[in-house]
Amino acid sequence: MAQQRAYRYFDLVMVAFVTVLVCSNLIGPAKIAQVDWPLLGPLTFGAGVLFFPISYVFGDILTEVYGYGRSRRVIWAGFGALGFAAIMAWVIVKLPPAPFWHNQGAYEIAFGSTWRIALASLIAFVCGEFVNSFVLAKMKILTAGRWLWTRTIGSTIFGEGVDSLLFYPLAFYGTGIIPNDKLPLVMLSQFVFKVGVEVVFTPVTYKLVGWLKRAEHEDYYDRDTDFNPFTLKT
């Protein structure tokens, strides 16, 4: 049996990925923000979208350095953490408050996401992340490891596209929270914003990828990888 490589920083990148994922989904959605941009005017968005794209940056780093197989395990770890956070929030919100505690309403607003939104978030996350990782791994082979920016941005376009196409209709269609005729505009604006974050972080991604490849003595190519998402093999 082949001995598994021991990596110095893989677990830290995994923790960073899961932390950004859970925090952006648990803390961010409760607040709707509006920022006035020069020339563009006011932009309204769910606050979680500000940080969620960073999970794609870490996803790109994981696949680029360690390969699809290890990235797949991290995606499922993130899925489990996000699912547990959703269940925990639901249970705590449903607990009857003490008679002297008068903050139940505010707590429900902050952490009382409906099951429809929570389920939509889980489905969109896992599908989008696997598409992102798959596209990056395949593009790395096609480009022979050159032009990292084409892989990070290209894979994010596909991954975030799938995420947005799944999340917004599954979470909001027919609910009245977002009018049905406004959903395409909301999806497009959020998609453009998320891809823009990836573009802005490209220099940081280059630095981290280069440093990790040197530190780990690893630059994985998924030439013989089983891309089945429903396995934990590395």
What are these regions (language model features)?
Residues 142-161:
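Internal alpha-helical transmembrane segments of multi-pass membrane proteins
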Residues 91-116:
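Membrane-interface interhelical connector segments
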Residues 209-234:
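Short, highly charged, low-complexity non-transmembrane loops/tails of multi-pass membrane proteins
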